[in-house]
């Protein structure tokens, strides 16, 4: 009779001893973990006894040794010692086998073993989160580097023993070697005296700030600075401000009344939500009071989140109920966690038999998508939820492999999401249950309109939709287009206000002094704000040029804009985050959502096109309760945006000051910049030549690959897109027009081929501009007509004679 088995566990094919020695289990486990993304692999895809198998062999050996008797134990003492060490490592697995009361699927250690508490979690600080960061650093070495070009040119000058260049280099080093406390000085008569970025001078700031605020509040134009010493005449308000103030207020009141009626019918009633809170009578002071699952609480503790922010306390309970949410809160208030936590909590109770993608989170920029991906994977490190990052600039082949594993959550930019939706067979969106639009007001603008419509018409209509932004739109018509069902509106300090810890400074550029803008910027960066500064530009070209100027002056800076490759963009953020560069020169690509730790100052080289963009720019500092400064160089065309910013700050009671730049410092930098103009042009020219050479090499390599692997390349299916190239260009132009229309600007129109009518109109206009010219009189015109008639008659007679001769 066969011996009775101790437990009722039924071995499958993978559990049999015949398969245990081939060594393939570990490879399969490693491969599945690699394909499954950053999270832990699923239970249904893993072999439940892969971790138990190495521990079964010693347990079976022990049973055989008992049957053999004491001789077997004495003969083999060394294997027994090895078995004890193995059992110590696999102690949890042994308990599962020995105790029938514990569930066999219970997991003692899930996720990364080295995961621990992280102080001041940074979305860019996750070493494993950023996709291929080290590989991207190697790829970036092929790109053109401004620092290398400048260093090479300086070495050439040193080799030529140019005494003038040597003296200039030494002067530059003397100017920028210190960055000490003595350098952070303002002019004695400066309007923002003592308004430095150092935290030690906060007491002086408050004393001077009271005077500054009183002065700037009297400036009815929303002044970007105090009048110069030369101006003695009292300030007179601008006529445009006086004319437009009353009409704007009247129009805004009418629009608010209409929108209020629409909102009352569209949004869920807020009273019912407040009534539920009163009945519950349980204040949410921590995440434990939200009844979150244990893995989610462990993930929050690992990041260092202990208490929810106001937007998190409001949004998480409602989002966990599956309701649509429209959330708005100030910058740096934790909106990302406000929608990630309820999503992860709901996914813990998903059906796990059939893997499918259930959540789609959309971001307007690639950097924001990478940051959200890192935060999500860190929060879900103690769960089996899987993630995929679909952003432009990364390898689409790697993303296709990741999508074959059917990740639970997809964090994407709209363009790459649509690309995979049309061209990747393994990517299915029919079972999406949750849709999230972060920075929703930007996603609803003209530039993303067609892409968003394409996504919304493809994914299921029966879904939960959540929108979040710091400047959340109140236009109901845009929200109706998304297909929301009685959404709950949650607004926490979202009245287009800045953060309380932010001090706003304005440097006014008088009319005719706009050419001194760069000199003002260089003085500020040299003397006042020397570390952890983000400088925003409107144009990519200007940001790159200033990057060259900074490099020539010895200031360590990185640039971030759309003309850079994705590898370069990530490297720029990493260099600034790690402290390798003190300045980040960026366009509005970095204005939304980017959360970099300890950014002390934000400088606007030019005021942005709208007040909403201004709020997002200055929101890169003073995040999560910290203090920070925002400095704006404002000229006459920036009057409207500056006026709105000062008015909102005055209503909010935040600190607004004006700063003056000493005239002698401005003149010194103007002379220095004039001397560097030729060097700047030479550097840009050399960079252009190197870039052209690298592009030629790339095209040559591509052509060689086309010849060598022609059959394989042609066998690949052609990638399709829902828009033509003309439609793409039209969409971009429409977005640029909408953006610049808000600032009262105009968009450059491309030259088109002139038709015949247009050419005649232009000729007529030229004739009119030339003035009076000689024209034929009536008699002359009559003579011409008579001659024409005579010629016509002669031609007819000739034709008749020819016809008669031909008949004969």
UniProtKB/Swiss-Prot annotation:
The keyword Nucleus belongs to this UniProt entry's keyword annotation: yes
Compartmental location: Nucleus, Nucleolus
Protein's organism: Phaeosphaeria nodorum (strain SN15 / ATCC MYA-4574 / FGSC 10173) (Glume blotch fungus)
Motif (Q motif): 285-313
Domain Helicase ATP-binding: 316-490
Motif placement: DEAD box: 438-441
Helicase C-terminal domain ranges (all copies): 517-674
Protein name: ATP-dependent RNA helicase DRS1
Keywords attached to this entry: ATP-binding, Helicase, Hydrolase, Nucleotide-binding, Nucleus, Ribosome biogenesis, RNA-binding
PROSITE patterns linked: DEAD_ATP_HELICASE, HELICASE_ATP_BIND_1, HELICASE_CTER, Q_MOTIF
Catalytic reaction equation(s): ATP + H2O = ADP + phosphate + H(+)
Transmembrane helix recorded as keyword: no
InterPro entries reported for this sequence: DEAD/DEAH_box_helicase_dom, DEAD_box_RNA_helicase, Helicase_ATP-bd, Helicase_C-like, P-loop_NTPase, RNA-helicase_DEAD-box_CS, RNA_helicase_DEAD_Q_motif
EC number: 3.6.4.13
GO BP, one annotated term: ribosomal large subunit assembly
């Amino acid at each position: 009779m066969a011996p009775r088995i101790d437990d009722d566990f039924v071995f499958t094919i993978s559990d049999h001893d015949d398969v245990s020695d081939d060594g393939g289990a570990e490879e399969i486990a490693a491969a599945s973990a690699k394909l499954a993304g950053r999270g832990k692999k699923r239970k249904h895809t893993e072999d439940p006894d892969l971790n138990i198998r190495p521990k079964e062999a010693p347990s079976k050996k022990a049973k055989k040794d008992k049957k053999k008797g004491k001789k077997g134990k004495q003969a083999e003492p060394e294997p027994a010692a090895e078995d004890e060490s193995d059992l110590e490592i696999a102690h949890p697995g042994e308990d599962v086998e020995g105790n029938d009361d514990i569930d066999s699927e219970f997991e003692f250690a899930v996720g990364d073993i080295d995961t621990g508490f992280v102080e001041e979690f940074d979305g860019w600080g996750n070493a494993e989160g950023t996709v291929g960061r080290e590989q991207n650093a190697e790829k970036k070495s092929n790109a053109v580097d401004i620092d290398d070009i400048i260093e090479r040119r300086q070495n050439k000058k040193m080799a030529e023993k140019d005494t003038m260049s040597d003296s200039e280099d030494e002067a530059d080093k003397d100017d920028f070697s210190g960055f000490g406390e003595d350098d952070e000085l303002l002019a004695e008569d400066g309007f923002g005296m003592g308004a430095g970025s150092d935290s030690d001078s906060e007491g002086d700031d408050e004393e001077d700030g009271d005077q500054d605020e009183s002065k700037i509040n009297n400036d009815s134009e929303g002044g970007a600075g105090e009048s110069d010493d030369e101006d003695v005449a009292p300030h007179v308000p601008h006529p445009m401000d006086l004319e437009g103030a009353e009409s704007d207020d009247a129009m805004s009141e009418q629009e608010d009344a209409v929108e209020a009626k629409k909102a009352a019918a569209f949004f869920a009633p807020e009273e019912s939500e407040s009534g539920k809170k009163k009945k519950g009578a349980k204040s949410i002071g921590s995440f434990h009071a939200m009844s979150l699952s244990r893995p989610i609480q462990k993930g929050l503790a690992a990041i260092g989140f202990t208490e929810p922010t106001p937007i998190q306390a409001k949004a998480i309970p409602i989002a966990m109920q599956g309701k649509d949410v429209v959330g708005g809160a100030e910058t740096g208030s934790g909106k990302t966690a406000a929608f990630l936590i309820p999503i992860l909590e709901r996914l813990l109770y998903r059906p796990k038999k059939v893997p499918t993608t259930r959540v789609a989170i959309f971001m307007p920029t690639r950097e924001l998508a990478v940051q959200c991906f890192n935060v999500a994977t860190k929060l879900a490190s103690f769960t089996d939820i899987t993630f995929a990052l679909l952003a432009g600039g990364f390898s689409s082949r790697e993303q296709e492999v990741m999508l074959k594993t059917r990740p639970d959550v997809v964090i994407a930019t709209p363009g790459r999401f649509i690309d995979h939706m049309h061209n990747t067979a393994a990517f299915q969106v029919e079972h999406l249950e949750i849709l999230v639009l972060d920075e929703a007001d930007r996603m609803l603008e003209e530039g993303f309109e067609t892409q968003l419509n394409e996504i919304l018409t493809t994914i299921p209509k029966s879904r939960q939709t959540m929108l979040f932004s710091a400047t959340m739109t109140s236009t109901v018509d845009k929200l109706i287009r998304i297909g929301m069902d009685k959404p709950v509106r949650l607004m926490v300090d979202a009245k287009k206000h800045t953060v309380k810890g932010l001090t706003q400074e304005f440097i006014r550029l008088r009319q005719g002094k706009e050419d001194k803008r760069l000199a003002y910027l260089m003085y500020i960066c040299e003397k006042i704000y020397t570390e952890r500064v983000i400088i925003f530009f409107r144009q990519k070209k200007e940001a790159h040029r200033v990057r060259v100027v900074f490099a020539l002056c010895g200031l360590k800076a990185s640039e971030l804009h759309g003309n850079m490759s994705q590898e370069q963009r990530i490297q720029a953020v990493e260099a600034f985050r790690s402290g390798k560069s003190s300045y980040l020169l960026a366009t509005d690509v970095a204005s939304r959502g980017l959360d970099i730790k300890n950014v002390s100052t934000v400088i606007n080289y030019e005021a942005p096109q709208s007040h909403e963009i201004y709020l997002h720019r200055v929101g890169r500092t003073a995040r999560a309760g910290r203090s920070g400064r925002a400095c704006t160089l404002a000229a006459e065309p920036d009057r409207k945006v500056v006026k709105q910013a000062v008015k909102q700050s005055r209503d909010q009671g935040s600190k607004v000051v004006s700063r003056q730049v000493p005239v002698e410092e401005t003149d010194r930098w103007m002379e220095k910049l004039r001397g560097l103009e030729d060097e700047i042009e030479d550097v840009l020219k050399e960079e252009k030549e190197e870039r052209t050479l690298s592009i030629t090499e790339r095209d040559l390599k591509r052509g060689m690959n086309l010849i060598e692997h022609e059959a394989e390349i042609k066998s690949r299916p052609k990638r399709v897109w829902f828009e033509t190239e003309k439609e793409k260009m039209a969409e971009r132009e429409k977005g640029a027009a909408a953006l610049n229309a808000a600032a009262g600007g105009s968009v450059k129109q491309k030259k088109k081929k002139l038709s015949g009518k247009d050419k005649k109109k232009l000729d007529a206009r030229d004739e009119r501009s030339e003035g009076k010219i000689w024209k034929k009189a009536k008699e002359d015109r009559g003579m011409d007509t008579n001659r024409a008639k005579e010629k016509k008659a002669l031609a007819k007679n000739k034709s008749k004679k020819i016809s008669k001769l031909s008949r004969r």
